[in-house]
Amino acid sequence: MTTILPNLPVGQKVGIAFSGGLDTSAALLWMRNKGAIPYAYTANLGQPDEDDYDAIPRRAMEYGAENARLIDCRAQLVAEGIAALQAGAFHVSTAGITYFNTTPIGRAVTGTMLVAAMKEDGVNIWGDGSTYKGNDIERFYRYGLLTNPDLKIYKPWLDQLFIDELGGRAEMSEYMRQAGFDYKMSAEKAYSTDSNMLGATHEAKDLEQLNSGIRIVKPIMGVAFWRDDVAVKAEEVSVRFEEGQPVALNGVEYADPVELMLEANRIGGRHGLGMSDQIENRIIEAKSRGIYEAPGLALLFIAYERLVTGIHNEDTIEQYRESGRKLGRLLYQGRWFDPQAIMLRETAQRWVARAVTGEVTLELRRGNDYSLLNTESPNLTYAPERLSMEKVENAPFTPADRIGQLTMRNLDITDTRDKLFTYVKTGLLASSGGAALPQLKDAKK
């Protein structure tokens, strides 16, 4: 039985994730005028481009909401963001520059906390502004039904009557004006922006074209570091972790993780740290392009990974990275609270993050240009005397020890050489001729 309602449920309570923008404002007013009973829910995610959160519910009431609530999601957002960082739950990257899954993290928090608030109010129908081509329609669908199994979904943007009457921004603006609300469309940007405290996403419109890039973007969390007229001074920064939790920046301790994240954003933002341009695969397997900001998470992640590599052994780090990529993809798909994701996340938090205690000092310059200056931790397994090129007393191993170790390697070297000549016999490799080893066949010869 479908949980998606194709038409407006007249006479019933309908919760709408209300941003206060033109789309959700017009949708709320339209639903009220058509006979539904709209309830507005606004998530305070610490969006850097929002000035007055308290005004948003008031506007919703003016537009016809039966009730309007502002839900403070900031603490939960930061908690989930740090959990993602601890697990390295980031699978999209280009040449080592990471997208920190800030939108998927935000959707996990919004989708659960808003639906939980609706459930408290006896509202079991939910609508939001996600379109059928994007990732969010599936993320919100999953998180909503996980939170409230009785939930039904109504999306104005999937209702043909709504589309026919209010199919574009011009029509929505005129609809608001005729209803007595002086709602003027904001100037159209060359791209759309979605943000929360962890990061910002810029995409669509001109950014759909790959010959249009970061230079048309106006950052909202930091500086346009690529511009010559923007002054960016080098800055020395220290980040301290205790058992996987970031606790101090530049020697200042923060009891509130939200305040720490805000300060990390300010520090990283002064340099444009954490901006990236990514081509990614959406949930439906079509490729999209986005330009991202995440100055605070980027700063914390640099320090965290430095400590991880100095504390853990190679096999643990390999498992952390492989599991992190898998977990990042699950997060991206809206599966952050699925059992397989919880298993990967809890493992990383317990066996990787809990050992991460220490302080990293780095110098930030422009964009993602930085240098590591110092790494300190009581848990470091890095011991320079083990491999020092100088003569040391009580050396952990001797030349004779290494001779023995290399001699043992003869076993697998012999096996490998025999296997290569086995491949010659099967025709997979060409005979060596004048070369010391068999060669890959040249199909042109």
UniProtKB/Swiss-Prot annotation:
Question: Which catalysed reactions does the entry list for this protein?
Answer: L-citrulline + L-aspartate + ATP = 2-(N(omega)-L-arginino)succinate + AMP + diphosphate + H(+)
Q: What is its EC number?
A: 6.3.4.5
Residues the entry annotates as binding L-citrulline = 99, 135, 139, 192, 201, 203, 280
A Gene Ontology biological process in which this protein takes part is: urea cycle
Q: What class of enzyme is it?
A: ligase
By its UniProt entry, which Gene3D superfamilies does this protein fall under?
Answer: 1.10.287.400, Argininosuccinate synthetase, chain A, domain 2 (3.90.1260.10), HUPs (3.40.50.620)
Residues involved in L-aspartate binding? 131, 135-136
Q: In which pathway does it act?
A: Amino-acid biosynthesis; L-arginine biosynthesis; L-arginine from L-ornithine and carbamoyl phosphate: step 2/3
| CDD domains found in the cross-reference section | ASS (cd01999)
Assigned protein family: Belongs to the argininosuccinate synthase family. Type 2 subfamily.
Question: Under what name is this protein listed?
Answer: Argininosuccinate synthase
Q: Which organism is it from?
A: Bordetella petrii (strain ATCC BAA-461 / DSM 12804 / CCUG 43448)
Give the taxonomic lineage as stored in the record: Bacteria, Pseudomonadati, Pseudomonadota, Betaproteobacteria, Burkholderiales
